[in-house]
Swiss-Prot record:
Annotated source species: Exiguobacterium sp. (strain ATCC BAA-1283 / AT1b)
Single GO molecular function: DNA binding
Domain of life: Bacteria
Name of the protein in its database record: Probable cell division protein WhiA
Family membership: Belongs to the WhiA family.
Gene symbol of the encoding locus: whiA
Length: 317
């Protein structure tokens, strides 16, 4: 089972008040419901999902709030993944339910925006967002390369209303048009964690946080190792260049042309090619000097080597 499925299963097991149940159901029906009209039968509502736990949640919320006759069907998808599709059907009093959920208007128009009666209270807003996530939400497991949570909506005005609702909780949610619909999305790990907590997925939030912390620690260690490796490569490269320049001087003009202080450090560098500048400074017979002092003397040797390569005469010490 995927991380998103685990989160949704947890959400379907939450205990809620009647008002919260209504807000959650309103989102589920608005986003996953299909209305049909037939002569002699009136209005029928089908709410479909591929998740059995969500289907049970829809069924139980409808029974709790309305106690209308309900049917539950299971069909097999014929395209791509041949998953089961669960359909909760309301054949009687569908119009009454849709009006009560503020989905169907007085003139039989579909209401895509959110009424303050349904989401004005903070707990109701949380419940509606929970229903929206159950209906059209997905989330990457934090172990994957990127953090991403999204909720798909068919209609732009409802998607914008969801964004505004989420951002009442400072989640920095954004919207994007997709083929055949619109999405609300979040990519900041802290905001995704806050959203999971907000809608009641406490276990999911804790699992997300655990994985995120481990991932961030690994990334920090990798950055540190990469930085240290780069510094080591830089140090090794500098040491090789220094040794090459000293040996070049030794072959061409001899190290005796160097001032005593430079000659001393040149001989130590060639003899001890693997030690650090600090260690070189501690080996000097004339007395220890700092890392920056050693670096300064080695740069002087590099400059003298370049002058010799250029044909300049070097006065002996």
């Amino acid at each position: 089972m995927s991380f998103a499925s685990d989160v949704k299963k947890e959400l379907t097991q939450l205990e809620v008040t009647d008002a919260e149940a209504k807000a959650e159901l309103s989102a589920l029906v608005r986003m996953n419901g299909v209305i049909s009209l037939a002569l002699g039968r009136g209005m029928t509502l089908d709410v479909s999902t591929e998740n059995a736990s969500i289907a049970r949640r829809i069924y139980s919320l409808m029974k709790r709030l309305y106690d209308h006759p309900l049917d539950l069907f299971v069909r097999k998808k014929m395209r791509l993944k041949k998953n089961n599709v669960y359909i909760v059907r309301v054949s009687q009093h569908a119009e009454t339910m849709l009006r009560d959920l503020e989905i169907l208007g007085e003139n039989y128009e579909m209401i895509r925006t959110l009424n303050s009666d349904m989401t004005g209270d903070e707990n109701l807003a949380r419940a509606y967002l929970r229903g929206a996530f159950l209906a059209g939400g997905s989330i990457n497991h934090p172990k994957t390369s990127s953090y991403h949570l999204e909720i798909y909506s068919l209609y732009e005005n409802h998607n914008q209303a969801l964004r505004d609702l989420a951002n009442r909780f400072e989640l920095n949610a954004k919207t994007l048009e997709r083929k055949k619909g619109h999405i609300l999305y979040m990519k900041e790990s802290e905001k995704i964690s806050d959203f999971l907590k907000l809608i009641g997925a406490t276990r999911g939030m804790l699992e997300f946080e655990d994985a995120r912390i481990i991932k961030d620690m690994r990334n920090s260690v990798n950055r540190l190792v990469n930085c240290e490796t780069a510094n080591l490569n830089k140090t090794v490269g500098a040491a090789l260049r220094q040794v090459e320049n000293i040996k070049f001087l030794e072959r061409t003009v001899g190290l005796d042309v160097l001032p005593k202080k430079l000659r001393e450090i040149a001989e130590l560098r060639v003899t001890h090619q693997d030690v650090s500048l600090q260690e070189l400074g501690e080996m000097l017979e004339s007395g220890p000097i700092s890392k920056s002092g050693i670096n300064h003397r080695l740069r002087k040797i590099d400059q003298i080597a370049e002058r010799v390569r250029s044909g300049d005469e070097i006065a002996s010490s």
